[in-house]
Amino acid sequence: LAAPNVVNVSVQSLVLIADGWFVGRLGTAELAALALVFPAQTTLQMMSAGAMGGGVASSVARALGSDDRGKAEDAAAHALAIAAAMTVLFAIVFVGFGRPLFGALGGSGAALEGAVAFSTVMFLGCGAHWLANTLASILRGTGDMHSPGVALITMAILQIPLSGALTLGWAGFPNLGVAGPAAAAVIS
C-alpha cells in the first residue's frame, strides 16, 4: 500500500532538486529567492497533502467502513470546501503579505524581488495543489492508493521538464526566470 506514496515522495524530491538546478543557472540571487520561499512552499505541501490529507483519508475511510456512503460524500464535500478556503488564505498571506514576510526572513534586493515573483505565481495558483492533494486523499480514503499515486507521480515527472522550459525559456517557452518553477508546479 505504501509503495506509490514512497515513489511519489521520492519523485517530489527530484522535482525540488531539478528546480534548484534550473534556478541556479539564473544566478545566486535567484537561488536565494527560491530559498526564501521554500518554507512557505513546504507549508503548502505539508498542509494540503499531509495534515489535511491524512484527516480527509481517515474521515472518508471511517465513513465507508461503517457503510455510510452519505457520510463519506459529506466528508469529501467538506474537504473540498476547506481546500477552497485554504487556497484563499494562502493566497492572501503569501501574495498579499509576501514582501514583508520574505523581507523578515532576510530577503532584500534581487532575492526579495525573485521571492515575490515566485510566490505570486505559486500562491495565486495554489488551488491546483489543494485540489490535487484533496482529491488524492479522498481516493486514498476509499482504499485506492494506486490511482492517486500514479496521478501525483505523473504530474511531478511532467513538472521537471516544464520547469526547465519555463525557467530557462527552452523550446520556445516563455522565459519566466525564477517564477518558472512556480508556473510549472501550478500547471502540472
Role assignments for model-derived ranges:
Residues 1-5, 60-127, 158-161, 165-188:
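Short alpha-helical transmembrane segments in multi-pass integral membrane proteins
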Residues 31-92, 129-143, 147-148:
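Small-residue-rich hydrophobic transmembrane alpha-helices
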